Regions:
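Active-site-proximal alpha-helical segments within enzyme catalytic domains
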Residues: 223-230, 270-294, 339-355
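Active-site Gly/Thr loop motif
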Residues: 255-256, 303-351
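Active-site-proximal binding-pocket segments
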Residues: 242-244, 248-310
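Catalytic-site signature segments of enzymes, centered on catalytic residues
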Residues: 116-117, 184-264
Length: 389
């Protein structure tokens, strides 16, 4: 399931905006095929390799106050073997890890030459950000409801495969439209669909509908980029500017971020490639945890938006509005090569991770990460309630 993550965007060849010898060689090949050296040099420098739109740092940073709780003595068991966080970093080629508990900073660590000032590519974590921007657009009155037809805001969809598809169907990956996300098949949709968004909209409108909307889950990267186009049409603005207005500035993001475009001065990909620091990814998790509240009584999301976003769809019990759901009530934004924002409302826990896995998706690394996060949660609870004494 999760191995079919967003890589459609990663076959870019024409989006080069700046290059030295190394960066030029990297731009000429899919991000999926970057060497380990290229990953570590490229992931923090996407804005120097591809066309992006800047999202300026907030004028007033939300401080991540250090908590009294610490993880220095933390160990956990994975596959019957004792592990430390250092083991996790080494075995999963992790570049950064931040843990927030009750809104305070419990742990922060970097490796592989990464640091708190560098941005890092999100891959499909951007989808969850788009989901929250949809909530903001509803709160602002640009969109009336997720039950509206997508074609209400993007009339070109009124004919073709998406003529009766709602925004909710698209957010839940349940449009019923045929889409092949097999990356090993060169004739698949994910490998052959257009890179430019306007061409993609036409391409997707000509696809076949296999199932009634809302009845079947099918991971569809092209559709998430379509979601970006619908949102852009509804708000009458680009996604990066709207993200700055609704989240980045008012919530106090510390650093500039960058969102990849389909061409120079083009449009953002709704399904991929926001680039931000790990601290600001953690703040995005905190923003979700706080239901978009910017200050007491002042929020940029509808009251129940995050509850609805993290509720199972009829088509898939493990998926909400571009968030992957966990059995324990937590949810996460997930990107290939090991990018995560975990949000656990009951435990008031946020975990943000930057990685450079050797493959786009590895189930064993996913299982290890889940074990790490659950073990951290249990460890902190024992600390809080003095259960180790």
């Amino acid at each position: 399931m999760l191995k079919h993550f967003c890589v459609w965007i990663l076959c870019l060849y024409g989006a080069l905006s700046w290059s030295a010898d190394l960066f030029e060689s990297m731009s000429a090949k899919s991000l999926l095929t970057w060497t380990p050296e290229q990953q570590l040099k490229g992931y923090p420098n996407i804005h120097r390799i591809y066309h992006t739109r800047k999202i300026g740092a907030s004028s007033k940073t939300l401080d991540l106050t250090s908590a009294n709780l610490r993880l220095e003595d933390f160990t956990y068991i994975h596959q019957k073997q004792p592990k430390t966080i250092d083991d996790y970093f080494e075995e999963l080629n992790t570049a950064g890890l931040i843990v927030l508990k009750n809104g305070e900073l419990v742990f922060e660590k970097y490796a592989l030459g990464h640091d708190e000032k560098q941005t890092w590519i999100s891959f499909s974590v951007a989808k969850s950000v788009v989901s929250m921007l949809y909530g903001a657009a509803i709160k602002d009155g640009y969109i009336e409801s997720v039950n509206d037809l997508a074609s209400t805001y993007l009339p070109s969809l009124s004919e073709g495969a998406y003529n009766d598809t709602t925004i909710k169907n698209i957010l839940q990956m349940a449009s019923g439209v045929q889409w092949n996300e097999d990356y090993e098949d060169l004739d698949s949709d994910v490998a052959s669909s257009p890179i430019q968004i306007l061409d993609l909209i036409e391409y997707m409108g000509n696809l076949k509908k296999l199932n009634p909307p809302g009845t079947h889950f099918n991971y569809n990267t092209g559709e998430t980029n379509l979601a970006g186009a619908v949102l852009r049409a509804a708000i009458g603005n680009n996604l990066a500017t709207y993200l700055h207005k609704k989240i980045w500035e008012p919530f106090g993001m510390e650093s500039d971020a960058y969102w990849m475009l389909d061409e120079a001065d083009g449009v953002e990909y709704g399904g991929c490639c926001l680039n931000a620091t790990l601290r600001d990814y953690a703040r995005l998790g905190l923003y979700a945890l706080r239901h978009g509240e910017l200050s007491p009584g002042n929020g940029s999301l509808p009251d129940n938006w995050m509850l609805d976003s993290a509720s199972p769809s009829e088509a898939a019990g493990y998926y909400g509005y571009y968030w992957w759901l966990r059995p324990n009530g937590s949810y996460r934004a997930t990107g290939i090569f090991g990018q995560f924002i975990w949000v656990h409302p009951r435990e008031q826990l946020v975990v943000a991770i930057h990685s450079a896995w050797d493959k786009a998706w590895r189930d064993d690394h996913d299982e290890h990460t889940a074990k790490l996060v659950s073990s951290i949660s249990n460890h902190l609870n024992r600390k809080i309630f003095n259960l180790d004494e």
